[in-house]
Amino acid sequence: MNYTFNEQVTKILRKNGWYPDRFININNYRRILEEKNYYLNQGAEKFFNNLGGLIITHEAYSDINDTDVSEFNPMKPAAWLDPKWVKECYEDIIKEKLCPVGVGFSEHMVFFVSESGGFYGGYDDYFCLIGDNIESDLLNLFNNHNFISLN
């Protein structure tokens, strides 16, 4: 049930309140997503159980000497985005359902987990793959910044 993060990611997560075997109750997230007609897939559920509620300060995308913040909960993106728009603009590209799991980059980018466990970012018409799985995603999000544009 737990992820296996590398040392870099583990250090950043621990500094921001995460700990091994973390498991939180996500009933509130589940309720919010259901109300907004989002599908809570298994990958997103695992993500929320282990990382939900964390606000992570990490290296900025545009300047390694600056910091950025990623917030892992679905409340803001579920309130901001219409699931029909997400389907038309993002899901149709990857042919999978997406669950919003947080925001980052000054709250400009919304993070999603797909049914297959991929981690994606969307900002208006821009849509990208951040990682094929959560472990590679967080390393890429926090340090490498090699996002793959999909549109």
What are the roles of these predicted feature ranges?
Residues M1-H108, S149:
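A surface-exposed partner-binding patch
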Residues V113-S116:
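Short acidic-glycine loop/turn motifs at beta-strand connectors
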Residues F119-Y126:
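Short, compact, well-ordered microdomains
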Residues F127-N151:
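Compact, glycine/acidic-enriched structural inserts
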